[in-house]
């Protein structure tokens, strides 16, 4: 089962006003979980799907935290540091957050209580520098396995070398890379924009290039992310990270074959219009993964962003029941939400987890 986290209390909103931001007042801290079961018992479930609206929370620790050294209209930069040998240490590996990167799928196998090998289930593409390999901690103890990657001219991973097998593993650990879709989150305490997210589209060793399309009219990046402000870099929720990248991780029903959405449960995302996606098995020269149900030319979409301040629609199009665990903590700080322009729409999640009134 995939260990994704979901939050609910969602609103689907259609707006007839100019694009703007609104802020909700602080409330006390609230946390908890809700388990939701979706059942479809129709004679023809694909023609009579059962819908629900949910959102993906940001999970996992920040891969970097620091203060901004400088800000331009589209970039933010950080200072380098030095280790005990006075060797310069840069915060990032160049190119790993590029929008052209597709993250690999890596699978570990054990030899005894250590990691013996890591298979490349899907090699990914687009890396200009070999990414850092991250292997989960062992079941017992803290002797964590380590490994390095090599890439080819297309930026695909061609090999994984185990540098330390570690010990204390009773089950094969999850293996990931530091790369692919990541977000910058403003963590400057007390600032009106605390909690705002920006997608990273490219990077070098000290600089991040950001997508500024979510800035409201009249806003600039320099106004929101100011010099010396504190930020975090975190992995962005994606179709693959939320729902799984292999059939073993998947809770939803996959398609019968690659190239068709038949037999699958669907996920709808909204970006200008609704588009549906499902997990498809390998076939037709394509690896197993997430694809559009109608536009196969988009290719594998495991890395398609599911923004943490937006929600999505799930369609149970197969018979049976699907149980989802909705977990999360309510925010205790003001949140600004960008409302669409006149006639626009988006599926909005409630950052507080309680009733929220949209008012003047």
Q: Could you say what each language-model-derived stretch is?
A:
Residues 1-25:
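Sec-dependent, cleavable N-terminal signal peptides
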Residues 60-71, 106-111, 147-153, 197-203, ...:
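Short, exposed beta-strand/loop patches in secreted or surface proteins that constitute
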Residues 107, 132, 146-148, 174, ...:
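Well-ordered beta-strand positions in beta-sheet-rich domains
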Residues 120-121, 160-166, 214-221, 291-301:
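Signal that preferentially marks extracellular ectodomain short beta-strand elements
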């Amino acid at each position: 089962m995939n260990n994704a986290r979901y939050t609910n209390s969602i609103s689907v909103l259609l707006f007839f006003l100019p694009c703007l931001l609104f802020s909700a007042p602080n409330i006390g801290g609230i946390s908890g979980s809700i388990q939701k079961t979706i059942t479809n018992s129709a004679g023809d479930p694909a023609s009579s799907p059962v819908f629900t609206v949910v959102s993906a929370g940001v999970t996992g620790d920040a891969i970097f935290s620091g203060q901004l050294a400088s800000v331009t209209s589209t970039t933010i930069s950080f200072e380098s540091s030095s280790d005990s040998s006075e060797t310069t240490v840069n915060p990032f590996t160049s190119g790993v957050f590029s929008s052209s990167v597709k993250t690999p799928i890596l699978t570990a196998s054990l030899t005894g209580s250590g990691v013996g090998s890591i298979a490349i289930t899907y090699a990914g593409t687009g890396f200009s520098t070999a990414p850092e390999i991250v292997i989960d901690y062992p079941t017992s103890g803290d002797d964590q396995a380590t490994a390095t990657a090599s890439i080819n001219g297309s930026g695909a991973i061609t090999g994984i070398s185990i540098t330390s097998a570690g010990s204390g593993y009773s089950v094969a650990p999850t293996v990931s890379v530091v790369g692919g879709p990541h977000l910058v989150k403003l963590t400057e305490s007390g600032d009106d924009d605390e909690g705002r997210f920006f997608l990273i589209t490219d990077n070098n060793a000290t600089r991040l290039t950001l997508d500024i399309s979510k800035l409201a009219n009249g806003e600039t990046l320099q106004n929101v992310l100011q010099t010396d402000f504190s930020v975090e870099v975190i992995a962005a929720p994606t179709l693959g990270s939320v729902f799984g990248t292999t059939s073993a991780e998947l809770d939803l029903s996959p398609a019968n074959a690659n190239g068709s959405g038949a037999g699958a449960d669907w996920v709808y995302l909204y970006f200008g219009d609704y588009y549906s996606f499902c997990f498809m098995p390998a076939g037709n020269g394509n690896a197993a993964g997430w694809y559009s149900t109608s536009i196969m030319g988009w290719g594998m979409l495991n890395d398609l962003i599911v923004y943490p301040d937006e929600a999505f629609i799930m369609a149970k199009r197969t018979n049976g029941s699907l149980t989802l665990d909705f977990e999360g903590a309510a925010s205790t700080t003001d949140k600004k939400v960008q409302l669409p322009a006149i006639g626009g729409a988006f599926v909005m999640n409630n950052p507080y987890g309680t009733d929220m009134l949209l008012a003047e």
